Design a protein with these regions (language model features):
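P-loop NTPase motor domains
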Residues: 65-75, 82-307, 333, 376-378, ...
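Phosphate-binding P-loop
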Residues: 30-31, 36-44, 237-238, 277
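N-terminal pre-Walker A segment at the start of P-loop NTPase domains
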Residues: 16-35
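Membrane-active amphipathic alpha-helices enriched in small hydrophobic residues
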Residues: 526-529
Length: 529
């Protein structure tokens, strides 16, 4: 067998055997001289990796991820501290590592190597963009992210209902903002159909969007939305793709972090077909800082998580919760986690001692040691383990020294990470798309309404102008008529005056003629006498 001392991410996989995965089982470590193995077919029965800070949870998670990748199973890892990213690069040799390699019986077989890795980052700095649409997130999870009251959540549900009924796509936060304003403007129209919508609740939701946008919501919500099928890939050599989500910044917003992970689970459940129990899972998720999923979560949300975890196994999906104490996970969810790795817990208070006792009682008893005492005695890289056997029965708890990973412990060099990002084939997510959605539709409607209103105003103004012109015309006509009547009356008076004067003149002439005739007659008579 040819052994390579150091193999990079794009090396020829056939140069080494998958030393920690063999015959359908994952080699996780040693209990004494006995190999502790996890059947691959049981990985979709979910699991728990718990332990105090610095006890080796990350190493356990990486060892499982490497073996799953070797088995051709894609993996999802949350990188909370930045050290998980080293899985893309070969590990570094040291004297201590050589001792561990010898201790686990891997001398001559062990090879440092990186694994096929795709980096993702909601903030788009440490990997490809991860986006979801507002519609996909849904009102329940969005209400939790925004810390809305019951009344405000009810209004948000109405807004989503209006979007569904109108066929409006809610891709990003500007779509949601536009629809909130639209619903508020038309609340009287929607009141009878959907219920009461108050301006105060709408204003509160709009205010809650401001910090979300500032914390990365503007980057997270949009298109192209993540296609979960892009996480279910293998490389050219058949190794499962290791999808690493950069959570160093995201985890600083626990509510957004938890809501994103829950959305992811729900999306997988709704997207993936029913397949039942398989020889190996289609995808395995490791959710670090799992306690954030349940912190301050309402009962209905915890119930949804329980239901999703319970049913997603039939989709061929395995889920491992990684947290400090089993007490961080509700009992209803804890009951679904059949594969357990318990690292050391530190207990000083009654509450902490009770948590240790509960953690120990979750294991099938081993008469060789006391599990409760062992949990507090475990060293770094050591754990109590219990996995389902191939018959589905939990094995007795074993005190196990966890095997060493083949990839780099710690963050890789920036160039190594950059090269992995460039060659993973997921560049389609790097550029945001602004498709026609609620914002554009409502903007067009608003513009059309404004144009129609402007046209109506112009029509009314035109009618007003026409009426005013008609009024002026009639007024002018009346004035002209009065003026004409006045002129006619004046002409009639003048004509009458002229006629009277003519009559008087004629009468005067007639009288003068008569008097003249009389004078001439008198003169003639006088002459005749």
């Amino acid at each position: 067998m040819k052994v390579a001392k150091s193999i990079t991410c794009n090396s020829i996989y056939t140069e080494v055997d998958a030393i920690m995965y063999d015959n359908g089982k994952i080699y996780l470590g040693l209990s004494g001289e006995e190999r502790v193995q996890l059947p691959l077919s049981m990985c979709n029965r979910h699991g728990l990796i718990a332990g105090a800070t610095g006890t080796g949870k990350t190493v356990t998670m990486k060892v499982l991820a490497e073996s799953l990748s070797d088995a051709g199973v894609p993996v999802f890892l949350c990188d909370v501290k930045g050290d998980v990213a080293g899985i893309c690069a070969p590990g570094a040799d040291s004297e201590d590592m050589q001792k561990r390699i010898e201790r686990f019986g891997l001398t001559g077989k062990f090879a440092y190597r990186g694994y096929p890795t795709t980096f993702w980052d909601i903030y788009q700095t440490g990997g490809h963009a991860v986006r979801a649409t507002v519609s996909e997130m849904g009102p329940e999870l969005l209400s939790r992210i925004l810390c809305l009251s019951e009344a405000q959540t009810g209004v948000l549900q109405i807004v989503f209902r209006v979007a569904d009924d109108r066929g409006l796509l809610l891709d990003d936060l500007k779509d949601l903002r536009a629809l909130l304003n639209y619903v508020n403007d038309h609340k009287e129209d929607y009141r009878m159909k959907y219920g009461n919508i108050t301006t105060q609740s709408v204003a509160a939701i709009l205010r809650a969007l401001l910090p979300l946008e500032k914390e990365g919501g503007e980057l997270f919500f949009g298109e192209p939305a993540l296609d979960v099928n892009d996480w279910i890939r293998t490389d050219a050599e058949g190794r499962g793709m290791v999808n690493v989500l950069d959570c160093v910044k995201l985890v600083q917003n626990p509510t957004l972090y938890a809501s994103f992970l829950l959305w992811l689970l729900s999306e997988l459940f709704e997207t993936m077909p029913e397949v039942g129990d398989l020889e190996k899972p289609k995808l395995v998720f490791f959710f670090d800082e799992a306690h954030m999923l349940f912190r301050d979560a309402p009962a209905v949300l915890v119930q949804k998580i329980e239901q999703t975890v319970k049913l997603i196994r039939s989709r061929g999906i395995g889920v491992f919760f990684v947290t400090q104490s089993p007490a961080d996970v509700p009992n209803t969810v804890l009951a679904q986690l059949s594969n357990r790795v318990q690292h050391a817990l530190r207990a000083y208070t009654p509450t902490e001692l009770k948590a240790v006792r509960v953690a120990a009682q979750a294991f099938r008893e081993n008469p060789a040691f006391n599990a409760e005492d062992a949990i507090m005695e475990l060293g770094v890289g050591e754990a109590l383990t219990s996995f389902l056997g191939e018959d589905g029965i939990p094995a007795m708890v074993q005190r196990t020294k966890i095997i060493c990973p083949q990839s780099l412990m710690g963050a890789p060099e920036a160039m190594t990470r950059a090269k992995a990002i460039l060659r993973d084939g997921m560049e389609k997510y790097d550029e945001a798309e602004d498709n026609v959605s609620a914002y554009e539709v409502l903007a067009d409607e608003t513009q059309a309404a404004e144009e129609a209103l402007a046209q109506e105003r112009e029509r009314l103004e035109e009618e007003k102008r026409a009426a005013e012109e008609e009024k002026q015309r009639r007024k002018q006509a009346e004035a002209d008529e009065k003026r004409a009547q006045k002129l006619e009356d004046e002409a009639r008076r003048r004509a009458q005056k002229l006629e009277d004067e003519e009559r008087r003149r004629a009468q005067k002439l007639e009288d003068e003629a008569r008097r003249k005739a009389e004078r001439e007659k008198e003169k003639k008579e006088a002459e005749e006498k």
